[in-house]
């Protein structure tokens, strides 16, 4: 009889303990759900502020719609060829009627002090369709200036079909350049709603691409290749976002302003691929071509240095 009482007490005790644990579980789950809800309801700005991530760039909030743009590579007209031939300070060759490679008669020094404006102005004195290009940067790994072509007053990032590369010697003088030109763009489909700049920044934050104490220094709309086929490219409106981790480290991200896809482009990797492609094209010039002889050696030397860097 006494054993029966003890057994009953044990059963009741276990029931009370189980009920207590169930209540504890529900309470913890409710607290966790509320924390998730609070986090999801906090704005992007609040999340960035909590990690001391600042936005110094102005945000283009008035731009709400844009469309994909289909562009073919331009083939040089007789007028283009005449203009190119009229440039007295260089010797040019044209390959496949769409790729210019030109060697300056004498190296041309860059204006000092080096600024984006002064370098761009100097380069534009020597190329076709000069007003359509803007300086992206100076790649010190290869000592090459990159200029991207604009379409609809917006830069087209990292495409071989609308690109000027200016090669510099050890004294930072321009020795030769290559150029490709995009044709006129045509809207593909109707206008689409754009992801706003703060949403694009939020996309990077949610991916873990933005870290505590970093600064968003620039966000601008341009175009980035979405589809590339032979001779035709479809460019998507794209937010280019520049992040500064410290005074010496800067990263660029490209967020598709319609679909939210994120791309990263490294200028050295891009240049290496472009130089290899250009080298194969230049080898189609006549063996006795002075342009081929000079540029082929320059590209071989730079690619060899870059290959050595990759192997280290």
For the regions a language model picked out, list residue spans one by one:
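Preferential activation on post-signal-peptide N-terminal prodomains/segments
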Residues: 1-134, 143-155
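Short, solvent-exposed aromatic-acidic interface loops
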Residues: 179-185, 270
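A short, polar/proline- and glycine-enriched secondary-structure boundary/capping micro-motif
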Residues: 157-158, 185-194, 264-266, 274-277
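Non-catalytic, structured segments within soluble enzyme domains
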Residues: 168-173, 179
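Short, non-transmembrane alpha-helical segments in secretory-pathway proteins
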Residues: 96-144, 153, 185-227, 287-294, ...
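Exposed beta-strand-loop-beta-strand "reactive/processing" segments of non-cytosolic proteins
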Residues: 124-170, 220-255, 266-267
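Extracytoplasmic/luminal low-complexity segments enriched in Pro/Gly and acidic/polar residues
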Residues: 197-312
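Structured extramembrane domains adjacent to transmembrane segments
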Residues: 162, 176-181, 190, 201
């Amino acid at each position: 009889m006494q054993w029966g009482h003890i057994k009953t007490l044990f059963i009741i005790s276990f029931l009370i303990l189980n009920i207590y644990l169930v209540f504890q579980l529900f309470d913890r789950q409710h607290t966790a759900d509320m924390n998730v809800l609070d986090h999801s309801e906090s704005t992007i700005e609040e999340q960035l502020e909590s990690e001391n991530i600042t936005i110094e760039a102005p945000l283009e909030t008035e731009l709400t719609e844009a469309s994909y743009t289909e562009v073919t590579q331009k083939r040089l007209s007789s007028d283009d060829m005449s203009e190119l031939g009229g440039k007295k300070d260089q010797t040019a060759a044209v390959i496949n009627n769409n790729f210019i490679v030109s060697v300056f008669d004498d190296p041309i020094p860059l204006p000092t002090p080096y600024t984006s404006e002064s370098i761009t102005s100097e380069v534009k004195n020597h190329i076709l369709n000069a007003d359509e290009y803007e300086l992206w940067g100076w790649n010190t790994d290869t000592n090459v200036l990159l200029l991207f072509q604009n379409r609809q007053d917006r830069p087209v990032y990292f495409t071989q079909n609308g690109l000027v590369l200016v090669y510099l010697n050890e004294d930072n003088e321009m020795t030769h350049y290559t150029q490709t030109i995009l044709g006129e763009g045509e809207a593909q489909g109707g206008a689409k709603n754009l992801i706003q700049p703060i949403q694009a920044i939020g996309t990077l934050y949610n991916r873990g691409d933005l870290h505590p104490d970093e600064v968003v220094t620039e966000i601008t709309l341009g175009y980035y290749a979405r589809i590339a086929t032979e001779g035709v490219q479809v460019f998507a409106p794209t937010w280019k976002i520049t992040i500064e981790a410290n005074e010496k480290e800067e990263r660029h991200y490209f967020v598709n302003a319609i679909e939210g896809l994120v791309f990263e482009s490294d200028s050295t990797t891009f240049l290496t691929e472009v130089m290899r492609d250009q080298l194969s094209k230049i080898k189609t010039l006549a063996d006795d071509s002075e342009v081929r002889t000079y540029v082929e050696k320059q590209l071989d030397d730079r690619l060899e240095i870059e290959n050595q860097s990759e192997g280290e």
